């Protein structure tokens, strides 16, 4: 049985909690894809991008306005340079935009777990220059969910932050399923090869970003989870500083299973059971 050090049930396992979602635009060889967390485009034109303040509990780490970049063949951008590099390398190997999205997303789940992860959900819009296809990969409520899920014993609504940080906010993830679906139709490189960048980073370690350090410092609830506390904070209880080498061999183990067995490895079997156990044994308010 694989042991899972999921950083945070409300962020890494499942993003069903009004967290900030990055709108993605991808283009490679005439194909545009709009999704979550990743941005690729073969740029002939770049429009203005507007952002809004993220809904709590994820704190803002501010934003910077910089001069845009242009490319004749393709370009890629993501919320973390390591994720961007992973997608870029896939494109250089002849991979499709969809291939690059998958590699980038797997790295984002490691280096930016507060905003992205295997347990999240996504919308994806695919445009090849002639037609548009939309894919719904958002989370769904657990089978046992009912209208009283977020009510207390007095039939009063639970406070938002209490609900979000509890096991009750966890839904059935959809991101991996939708990525598997679009890869089947539009992928070029083997599915297994797309997980190598994230597996290597999780095994060998990555440097904590300034954004992660800032958000860890602002998060008031992360230490409520012993596993998350051990992973994100040092022995004195302080968040890892920018530049700290952080490893996650458990995440690498999960990705290896998914790379070999597809999205079903997350939705059933030992990984799924580990998620269910985590949710149902959440310390303050267990979920379904």
What are these regions (language model features)?
Residues 41-42:
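C-terminal motif of bacterial Sec signal peptides marking the signal peptidase cleavage site
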Residues 50-85, 89, 97-261, 266-268, ...:
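Noncatalytic scaffold domains of N-terminal-nucleophile
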Residues 1-27:
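N-terminal secretory signal peptides that target proteins for export/translocation
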Residues 29-34:
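Sec-dependent signal peptide recognition
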Residues 46:
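Residues that scaffold, gate, or flank divalent-cation-dependent active/transport sites
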